[in-house]
Regions:
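Mixed-charge, low-complexity intrinsically disordered regions
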Residues: 37-170, 178-183, 266-576
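Short, well-ordered loop/turn sites that connect or cap secondary structure elements
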Residues: 192-199, 204
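Bacterial N-terminal signal peptides that target proteins for export
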Residues: 2-18, 31
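C-terminal segment of classical bacterial N-terminal signal peptides
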Residues: 24-34
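Active-site neighborhood of thiol-dependent amide/isopeptide-bond enzymes
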Residues: 185-193
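Glycine- and charge-enriched low-complexity intrinsically disordered segments
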Residues: 233-279
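Catalytic Cys-His active-site segments of thiol-dependent hydrolases/isopeptidases
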Residues: 207, 215-237
Length: 576
């Protein structure tokens, strides 16, 4: 066992260095990317000792405005009219992936409002070594922190934002929910699940390596989210079953920013604060701190034993037992939760439209940068969902898996609502007379309103509705080295005929079908296989080679089957 420690450390060290170098190049090489240039920007002067409740409300409003804006790129969002501070940051190219995105929002708002800001810039595994700090089995611990210096003339905010990109990864969120150090404290804490504890600006961490910002909480309890991706694109969705519950040591789920204060600073005549140190409120001093999302609503016991039994946690609302995700929806609703199935399917279709639109940006970026014209690799990355280099920036396995999970959730949710309506559940409201027909009509209407175009390799355009994409969802290639026709799941025939992939890439596409059938991401299994090894199996959820049969995620097909059953059950009287 001992002989594995050093190689594991070296592997982690080399990857960390490579990632840091990549981040540096990303910011500083003007030939490859936008240059981070904050010419004409205001310096970051700290004039407030702490964030007030008014500041927090202002931050929530800022996040909500950006979330609501029609922007699909990080830089475009911060340069949009939704940003009231856009005239003050000078010439600066904003870049972020999902992990950096919440920190970029928080730091930027602090800069524009003279607020203190600090962040954890070093994390290590809670125990043992790891090949990738983002996917440790027992979570991470904070080992170092950095604060924006409080100086008389202010500091260059651009340098802070660049530091964030090299310091923050999804591993920065992977810490125990009870972590409570006074010195190396975590930037965030676990909040109470209600409309006071979760609001625009709150964060959700997905154990499978994704982070989103809450940008709105609807009156019906739906939590709307916005996130960034390695290609700098922005996507919008909503909180649901694609965010898995886990042991609290991994810190998954909802998070809120921990309040900090600049202590011991000297105030100059112009109001600028100089010197001092950053302190944070401990968990016990936070009115919204809660482990409810891990232990449930029916106990206040936070012992290690209870935390270890997180799978047995129970959730209830107004005396009614609910599964966790239904509970979140009910707890976040304004008043008693009621769901109209027709409105629910429309909302989910609009979210899917956002997902498809964001995916188009990712695919187009790979094509624009010529990744599809590069030779196929000999084998896949060690894990296709979390890696480095071209694959990390231009592939879409995680994005595609989240999309398929959203489809599965849509199907299961509508099926449950139909059953609840049939049982007369008070939480389901429907005023019509033909629920199945109205659901199909709403589905088709939303599908037709969301049209995506892609340009084939021969320059002609293909038009896809939401339903078209769903029909071919398990044929959508996540592999950036493949032609755009395969990235959009073109079937053999006219549409696929313009694909210029080599026979080697043909072999890859066929072998990767097992991985395309997956909807659950597995970051802790080896997936670095060749096409022959993928074909040979064994296949299974945790095999690293994918599964043979794709799950049923097609809600329209389900509704059609119900409609046909209804029609078949109608007795036609004999003619007399």
């Amino acid at each position: 066992m001992r002989r594995n420690v050093l190689p594991s450390f070296l592997s982690f060290f080399v990857k960390s260095v490579c990632l840091a170098l990549l981040a540096t190049v990303w910011f500083l090489n003007p030939q490859l990317i936008h240059k981070a240039n904050a010419a004409g920007a205001e310096p970051w002067r700290i004039t407030k000792e702490a964030w007030s409740e008014a500041d927090e409300r202002g931050y929530s409003e800022f996040v909500e405005a950006i979330g609501r804006a029609d922007c699909w790129n990080v830089d475009d969002c911060f340069e949009s009219t939704a940003n009231p501070f856009r005239s003050r940051h000078g010439r600066f190219s904003f870049r972020a992936d999902c992990a950096d995105f919440p920190y970029l929002f928080r730091a930027y708002y602090a800069w524009m409002n003279g607020l203190p800001f600090a962040f954890q810039n070093g994390v290590l595994p809670q125990s043992g070594w790891t090949r990738d700090i983002r996917y440790t089995r027992n979570g991470n611990k904070v080992v170092s922190r950095k604060a924006v210096p409080a100086t008389a003339n202010g500091v260059n905010a651009a340098s802070i934002l660049v530091d964030l990109r090299s310091a923050i990864s999804t591993g920065s969120y992977r810490h125990h929910a009870i972590a409570n150090s006074s010195s190396n404290f975590t930037d965030m804490y676990s909040p109470r699940i209600d409309r006071d504890g979760i609001r625009p600006g709150s964060i959700v961490y997905d154990v499978n390596g994704h982070v989103v910002l809450v940008w709105r909480v609807e009156d019906d309890g739906r939590v709307l989210t916005v996130s960034a991706h390695p290609d700098n694109s922005v996507s919008r969705s909503f909180y649901g079953r694609n965010f898995l519950r886990t042991h609290p040591r991994l810190g998954t789920g909802f998070k809120e920013w921990r309040p900090i204060r600049l202590v011991g600073a000297r105030r100059l005549a112009n109001g600028t604060l100089v010197g001092g140190r950053i302190e944070a409120l401990p968990n016990e001093a936070l009115p919204n701190y809660s482990l409810m999302q891990y232990i449930g609503t029916e106990t206040i016991d936070t012992s290690a034993r209870t935390l270890d039994q997180w799978r047995q946690a129970t959730f209830a609302r107004s005396g009614e037992a609910l599964d966790y995700y239904h509970f979140v929806r009910a707890a976040m609703a304004s008043g008693d939760l009621t769901m109209d199935p027709v409105k629910e399917i429309r909302s989910s279709m609009r979210s899917l439209c956002y997902d498809i639109r964001a995916r188009k940006q990712a695919v187009d970026a790979a094509i624009a940068n010529g990744i599809d014209r590069m030779a196929a690799p000999n084998r896949l990355p060690q894990n296709i969902y979390g890696t480095f280099g071209y694959w990390e920036f231009y592939s879409t396995p995680s994005r595609d898996a989240r999309f398929k999970t959203a489809l599965k959730e849509q199907r299961d949710h509508i099926e449950a609502l139909i059953a609840m309506h049939a049982q007369g559940a008070s939480t389901v409201t429907y005023a019509g007379t033909n629920l199945i027909g109205d659901l199909l009509e709403a589905y088709d209407d939303e599908s037709a309103q969301c049209i995506t175009y892609y340009t084939r390799s021969n320059g002609t355009n293909v038009q896809l509705s939401i339903n078209d994409v769903i029909d071919r969802v398990f044929d959508l290639s996540f592999d950036p080295y493949q032609c755009i026709e395969r990235r959009w799941g073109a079937q053999p025939g006219e549409e696929q005929s313009s694909c210029r992939d080599t026979p080697v890439k043909d072999t890859w596409y066929k072998a990767e079908r097992f991985l395309r059938n997956l909807i659950d991401r597995t970051y802790d299994v080896d997936m670095g296989y060749t096409p022959r090894e993928l074909e040979a199996g064994p296949h299974g959820q945790f095999s690293g080679r994918g599964i043979v049969e794709a799950p049923d995620v097609d809600v329209r097909a389900y509704l059609i089957s119900l409609q046909q059953r209804q029609q078949a059950s109608v007795v036609v009287p004999e003619a007399r």
